[in-house]
């Protein structure tokens, strides 16, 4: 591959980090021009770089690469394919392909001429896959040949008909590779481009679906441009940068933020098919990457992995992502010699973001006073029993005090109005569920993030938990994320997820942690460890030792099924343990013990 190197790479000389104000101002400068050119889409950004540096690598994988000129031409072929296939402005094309160069080229090209591209999770099968396709109502589906069986398996559940095009197999009846090869790759004429503007919908990106069926969030061309240039500014990206992206391209962080931040700056994106802890550092060194995009669980997996001879031979200057917890921040940065961490908070469908440009360990960001109008965020108190916002005598929501956890909300509107745009979902009813009205004044409206946060005395926001993941036990709120951190820090625990389970005759829900362990795990010492880390009400009452934990493609844990199975040894084949209220240690939970809990003989 062009530009690949091997062996030891000389570490760059330590450069003084730019001030927070300069970082913010750079991002503002790069995004300020978006509104002045409403007909300029992200594909035009690629074209501009293709004119300036045609031979520089834009996208690369282990076995292929495209320079900027090649990417520009590939985008044009996909745009002309959409037109030739009859894709009109607003029509949807579903994309079911693994990470790769053509993934990015496809959605950039199809959306350039007004098509809307639905980015479908490649791990879905059956009814789940049919649901996501059905929500999008596509006229066409582009599917990788290796994923065609999954699509065929979902066909009986599909209620919409779409033309299916196969990618990667020229022998198929509708082979998109063959169709693309027959099309011109030169610049599009004004007539071919049509009247597409930044206000138009470009993509459908699905929520993770950890608690239910995924919802399709609407992503406009404006949002793509803002994400790309904003992160290019925050990271100080240049054409010399190479970013490693091993996150799924069908999600907003891996598929839009990571590649577009580099392409906006003329840099290069190295795309891995998926995350691999064993391949991660060799890839970083081999491709001479200067940045990588992370999510928090990726960092935790890397810390749990055995040392690699490559982990300190990199030339990284910055890593960017979200979800890096405070309990591993310092260890992660020190072990892997990472000069700077840019942590941020954002929701695919949300209308405000937070950015920790100062590198404050454990914080997800702050809002500088000069940008308060651009990122209008607040924290409101919630009813601990039902999760609804509390209201005062006048009927308005109650702001949280410093240090107090509450739901993060963002005011809906334009920047000029002191708000942020909320583009919502494809279903109006789902959009309405996320809007909180008459919050601090009659007639105002705010986006509900569904996330609990607290604001510290320095003005930094800290993530506490997802509202649906928090439960009450012994009259106290338990944040599952904090419990997970404590459990994972115990010797021999590879992974953990925590949830609440109901016990007959008790109020609230008791904590239960499902864990994956190795040979170093000793259950008899776990209770003492947790007693040092957690208050009594937050310590898991039950422990389940599982072979593996189910998670989404971005490592968000799926715990609904675990919660339904509960702690009944008759329904769960995994080993179960209970925190004995008499001894304070974890003991085996068998059928006899379960019956005593059910009868109230053992009171927890």
Where are these regions (language model features)?
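AMP-binding/adenylate-forming catalytic domain of the ANL superfamily
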Residues: 534-557, 574-601
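AMP-binding/adenylate-forming catalytic core of the ANL superfamily
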Residues: 124, 131, 141-143, 292, ...
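Conserved AMP-binding A3 loop
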Residues: 67-69, 195, 202-226
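ANL superfamily adenylate-forming
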Residues: 24-25, 148-198, 375-377
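Conserved AMP-binding/adenylation subdomain of ANL enzymes
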Residues: 114, 225-242, 250-290, 305
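Conserved AMP-binding/adenylate-forming core of the ANL superfamily
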Residues: 36-39, 43-47, 55-100, 104-108, ...
